Each structure stands twice: as C-alpha cells, then as structure tokens.
Amino acid sequence: MTRRETVDVGGVPISYLTAGKGGPLVLLLHGTYWSRVWQPVLDGIAASGLRPVAVDFSGFGRSGGELTVSEASVPRLSAWLVSFLEALGQKGPVMVAGHDIGGGVAQHLMLANRVEVARVAVVNGIMYDSWPVPGVARFRDPAVAAATTRDDVLAARRVSVVKALGRPASEAEIAEYLDPWTDPRVARSWLALAGAADHRYTMEMLPALLQSKTPKLLVWGEDDPFQTIDYAERYAREIPDTRLVRIKSAGHIPMENDPKAVAGALGKFFACKQ
C-alpha cells in the first residue's frame, strides 16, 4: 500500500512516496511535476519485490526547502541525491528511474560515479536536445521569472498537467496535481528548475553514455507532445545496452494512462538479477 514518509536531509524535511515491505531500492525521480506522477505504479513496482521511493526534490511536492536556479540544475540535483540516499541509510548499489527532467538527473547520477547505479530507466524523460520545451524555456529569462506570480505558475502548470495527462481528468484530480504550487515557496522552486533548464547537460553526457554498459530501459508514452518518441528511438539505437518499451495510447505521464504496463515494465527490468 502506498504511503508517504519523511526524512531529514541537511536539516530539510524531504518527503517521499513508497510502497511494499522492503527489497532492493528503486529511486524514482520527478521533473517539472512532483512525486505524484509515480503514485499509480508504486504498488505494482513493489509487487516485484522492490522498494520504490518516489522522492520530492527540495522545494517540490510535499518536501520542505526551496531551490535556487544554481541548485536546480541537472548536475546539482544529481549531487543532492547522494545526500538523500545517505539519509535513507542506503548502502551499496541503487537503481534509478526518472521522468521528465528527472530522466536527465537519473542518467547523470549513473555517470557521475558518486554512487553505484546498477540499472537506469527513463520514462518520457529528457535526452539530447529535447528540452527545455517552450512552456518551460520562457521562464529562463530572469526578467520573465521575476515578473511571474504564484498564480501565473498555477495557470501555466494547469495547462501542462491537462495536456500531460493525455486523457480526460476531473477537476479534483487536476487540483491534486496542482496543489503543491499553491504554496509560493514551491512555485518559486519550480521557476528555479525552469530557469536552470539547459540541454547542454544532456548533450555533455553523450560521450560517456556511448561508452556506458549499465543496463538502461526507456518506457515511453507514444503520444507524448512534450518529449516525443523519436528521441527515445534514437537513444535506443545509439546508446549501448538500451531497450525501448512503448506504451500505446499514452502521453507524457504514461503512469496515468496505463499503470499496469508501466509498472510491469519497470518491475521486470529492476527485478532482473543479471
């Protein structure tokens, strides 16, 4: 059963969703959304004998803290995860899945060698020069970000959430997704993440990715209007030890369109002994 827990990381209360009764740790990362994107698949992943942990980065979701632009880059978020894993008491290899910008953070964590990453999955995540999308890129202008209010962030995120779900959604469900950004602190953290969005980070990973032997899985909603499947197809062709699983009739958050298929693909991949 899915539950929310909290751990102290450097004096900041960090929230995460988890499920199951233990097993090998699978770290689940969000991007421009929050841990809520993983909720539909947590029980399914746990059913494979795994311990899923869907963390809210500092300043996001239900976590405390607030991100600055300098703290919100892919490399800095990757480095922060080392402290989070230490706070969890995690020792030994870890497995990671990332959605959206979290997909870039997952790849960076794998390549940085600060912790041993045994397997990596990217779910409709950033790669190559696929990002930032226009709805995020416009906030990279400091003047635009400075003039943006909490209500502006809420309005922009509403548009993105409705589009990303890729299916009809009730007002209650949309409100649940948007709720963290009603806090001005969390809205400012989102603006920091947008301000730090730069595809040079994923492009700089390419030489190391081309040499990487770590098993990798791409799980992709085929109808994603943000991170289009052609990027995933290219990645699967070019990057060693990569397999692509397509989720039909699914958008940017395929966990919401076909949770059984997504949880099944991730559970099988992360539970593999080889």
PLM regions and their residue ranges:
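Flexible "cap/lid" loop of the alpha/beta hydrolase fold
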Residues: 111, 118-148
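N-terminal cap/lid segment of alpha/beta-hydrolase-fold proteins
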Residues: 1-13
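Conserved serine/cysteine hydrolase catalytic core
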Residues: 186-237, 246
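Conserved HGGG/HGGXW glycine-rich cap/lid loop of the alpha/beta-hydrolase fold
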Residues: 18-62
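Active-site loop/oxyanion-hole signature of alpha/beta-hydrolase fold enzymes
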Residues: 10, 17, 54-97, 264
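Gly/Ala-rich beta-loop-alpha elbow adjacent to hydrolase catalytic centers
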Residues: 98, 102, 106
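Conserved alpha/beta-hydrolase catalytic His-Asp/Glu region
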Residues: 131-133, 151-210
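Catalytic active-site module of serine/aspartate enzymes centered on a nucleophile-bearing elbow/loop
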Residues: 242-274
